[in-house]
């Protein structure tokens, strides 16, 4: 049986936490930032957790995480 390949794009975007969840960076903080409010940018700064509905997809992409 061959090894399962890790989806490299997912490996760069998600990190596993101690409890088994996955954290990721929020979107909308890369460019065109002048028109976005400081409060909005501040709230986008901390990492977010992958929702329960998407968790299975992330686990399938990262078999060895």
Swiss-Prot record:
GO cellular component terms, A-Z: cytosolic large ribosomal subunit
InterPro entries to which the protein is assigned, alphabetical: Ribosomal_bL35, Ribosomal_bL35-like, Ribosomal_bL35_CS, Ribosomal_bL35_sf
Organism: Enterobacter sp. (strain 638)
Superkingdom assignment: Bacteria
Keywords, ordered alphabetically: Ribonucleoprotein, Ribosomal protein
Family: Belongs to the bacterial ribosomal protein bL35 family.
A GO MF term: structural constituent of ribosome
HAMAP family on file: Ribosomal_bL35
Gene, per the UniProt record: rpmI
Protein name: Large ribosomal subunit protein bL35
């Amino acid at each position: 049986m061959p090894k399962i390949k890790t989806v490299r794009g997912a490996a760069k975007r998600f990190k596993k936490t101690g409890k088994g969840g996955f954290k990721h960076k929020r979107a909308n903080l890369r460019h065109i930032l002048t028109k976005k409010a400081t409060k909005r940018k501040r709230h986008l700064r901390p990492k977010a957790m992958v929702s329960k509905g998407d968790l299975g997809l992330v686990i399938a992409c990262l078999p060895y995480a």
